[in-house]
Amino acid sequence: VLVAGSLSLVTIIGNILVMVSIKVNRHLQTVNNYFLFSLACADLIIGVFSMNLYTLYTVIGYWPLGPVVCDLWLALDYVVSNASVMNLLIISFDRYFCVTKPLTYPVKRTTKMAGMMIAAAWVLSFILWAPAILFWQFIVGVRTVEDGECYIQFFSNAAVTFGTAIAAFYLPVIIMTVLYWHISRASKSRIKKDKKEPVANQDPVSPSLVQGRIVKPNNNNMPSSDDGLEHNKIQNGKAPRDPVTENCVQGEEKESSNDSTSVSAVASNMRDDEITQDENTVSTSLGHSKDENSKQTCIRIGTKTPKSDSCTPTNTTVEVVGSSGQNGDEKQNIVARKIVKMTKQPAKKKPPPSREKKVTRTILAILLAFIITWAPYNVMVLINTFCAPCIPNTVWTIGYWLCYINSTINPACYALCNATFKKTFKHLLMCHYKNIGATR
């Protein structure tokens, strides 16, 4: 009883820590971790209800709460357990598409999509198990489970038992193993490619999320940007059709983000001109200001690192500032040359970020824990369909408890494989709430 109670308590605390960590730490609020949040919800329910009711059943030696509570407990237990498996499948597929479709999948990979997938996992698990467990006695016309016992009635049918074991465990495990093999292979291939590929052969423009910043010097006579300041973005070497305008005031920077590489340019004290470079077809319209006293030109290109779990690459920051003692024509030429130079400059590729390794490592740990803890019970289920007396009750109990222990192990997997989870857990346990939302 003491061991079972301790396991239940550790499971509850561990999974509450996971859920609270994701809630309070913005660096953990990623699509992948939302799937882990759903998994933690399932594990928490197992720790609160399933473990304690099963302990009661095994310690007393019979089921004391009647057939209705028995069926409700079994339905909850199997729905939640199946939801855990479905969440693991979702996590594996999500990682697989991140690695194999890095350009198209991240666009679709939104919080809304994650919520829909999580909801589908729970609804499907409920449909698969709850009606069959609760209403099987009415389908066959009789309840065959004896008083004082609690088990799923249709498990007495060997064919049904075999089919549910295949669908609930063996098939998902095969799918997840194959997916992880592809994930590992694709990740290694990318690492080798990044090491072998010389910088000169890399694309001149990086397909990352780039943030253009426009800074305008203070001038008391300066009109609003709506009157006389125009900004154009250069995207992938070509000017877009519509100009992008932003308000620039003292001490303020306006930011604009786009999924393609972009350069925002501002030039003051210049006449409208278009400068074209044939090699990369880079063109920009340099803005016009009514104020003749302003003599500073500033171009800044910055990359913005999105909050994600390594489905999107990141780059560096480049800043170019023009001098203030030149006439308009000279400024125009300087601005145009620097824009062209920056758009032609090869992007330096970095090795896959540590966050990507964290995610892959976490998934591997979760899958291994799931397979190791769930395999004994599901092997016994298959044996039981052919030879019921072959498995003693004690072995059944151990196998069943191993499935529950998986819910205890999962939070430890997150902490061991992800330093951010580990640090956030530590802050929560030690009541260090200051700056916990920014813990990395």
From Swiss-Prot:
Keyword presence, Transmembrane: yes
Family under the similarity heading: Belongs to the G-protein coupled receptor 1 family. Muscarinic acetylcholine receptor subfamily. CHRM2 sub-subfamily.
Chief location of this protein within or outside the cell: membrane
UniProt function note: The muscarinic acetylcholine receptor mediates various cellular responses, including inhibition of adenylate cyclase, breakdown of phosphoinositides and modulation of potassium channels through the action of G proteins. Primary transducing effect is adenylate cyclase inhibition. Signaling promotes phospholipase C activity, leading to the release of inositol trisphosphate (IP3); this then triggers calcium ion release into the cytosol.
GO molecular function: G protein-coupled acetylcholine receptor activity
Record-listed Phosphoserine modification sites: S206
PTMs per UniProt: Phosphorylated in response to agonist treatment.
Residue ranges crossing the lipid bilayer per the database entry: 1-19, 34-54, 72-93, 114-136, 159-183, 362-384, 393-416
Annotated Polar residues bias: 258-267, 278-287, 308-327
Pfam families: 7tm_1
CDD domains, per database record: 7tmA_mAChR_M2
Side Extracellular, residues: 55-71, 137-158, 385-392
PROSITE patterns attached to this UniProt entry: G_PROTEIN_RECEP_F1_1 (PS00237), G_PROTEIN_RECEP_F1_2 (PS50262)
Important for signaling, short sequence motif: residues: 94-96, 410-414
Feature: compositional bias, Basic and acidic residues: 228-244
Domain of life of the organism encoding this protein: Eukaryota
The species this protein was found in: Pan troglodytes (Chimpanzee)
GO biological process: adenylate cyclase-inhibiting G protein-coupled acetylcholine receptor signaling pathway; chemical synaptic transmission; G protein-coupled acetylcholine receptor signaling pathway; G protein-coupled receptor signaling pathway, coupled to cyclic nucleotide second messenger; regulation of heart contraction; regulation of smooth muscle contraction
Listed name of the protein: Muscarinic acetylcholine receptor M2
